[in-house]
Amino acid sequence: MEQQTAYSLKQSIIFSHKFAQLSKALWKSVEKDWQTWIKPFNLNINEHHILWITYHLDGASISDIAKFGVMHVSTAFNFSKKLEERGLLTFSKREHDKRNTYVDLTEQGRELFLETLEAYKPSTYSVYGGALPIKDLYGKFPEFSELLSIVRHVYGPDFIDMFETALTRLEDGFIEEDGKLKAVDSETKSTV
């Protein structure tokens, strides 16, 4: 006897279509806003994302960048190479891992990344603006627990761990000062 599926084909296609359509709509807005944000720094989204990941991982392998940046390994490598040519990243091998290629931010790369964060303006981000009515109504931004669960099942717990680590580092490693996000230096961290 055939085992019945718990979910119908119709439910599956409706869910998948809703998710695809809403994700595409949100991504279109995020992509436009992200490109506008980083354009003055002569960066594209992949390059900025690589700087972001490398900053939060304090150096990263090309494989990690591909995994956490949700991009093909060749994309991660090629855009990292462009960043290296601009003096923003360096390539190296680790003593404990000669197989993988690692990238680290140069001081210039770190400074540029931090400049991009200082230049962020919430009023220019449509998705953020779209969430404000929810915050006004409920006193907090939407939670992402269901979405995180889906992503965890698709990409695995390592992806979510890195995501949460980056958020914690952003929360703990930056302060708002004069309407801008600034990195907390090691002296400030020890007194906070």
Swiss-Prot record:
One GO BP: sporulation resulting in formation of a cellular spore
PROSITE patterns: HTH_MARR_1, HTH_MARR_2
All copies of domain HTH marR-type, residue ranges: 12-156
Residues within the DNA-binding region(s): 62-85
Record keywords: DNA-binding, Repressor, Sporulation, Transcription, Transcription regulation
Molecular-function GO terms, alphabetical: DNA binding; DNA-binding transcription factor activity
Superkingdom of this protein's organism: Bacteria
Pfam families xrefs: MarR
Secretion signal, residue range per the UniProt entry: none
Alphabetized InterPro entries for the sequence: HTH_MarR-typ, HTH_tscrpt_reg_Hpr, MarR/SlyA-like, Tscrpt_reg_MarR-type_CS, WH-like_DNA-bd_sf, WH_DNA-bd_sf
SMART domains to which the protein is assigned, alphabetical: HTH_MARR
Subunit structure: Homodimer.
UniProt function note: Negative regulator of protease production and sporulation.
The protein, known as: HTH-type transcriptional regulator Hpr
Organism of derivation: Halalkalibacterium halodurans (strain ATCC BAA-125 / DSM 18197 / FERM 7344 / JCM 9153 / C-125) (Bacillus halodurans)
Lineage per the UniProt record: Bacteria, Bacillati, Bacillota, Bacilli, Bacillales
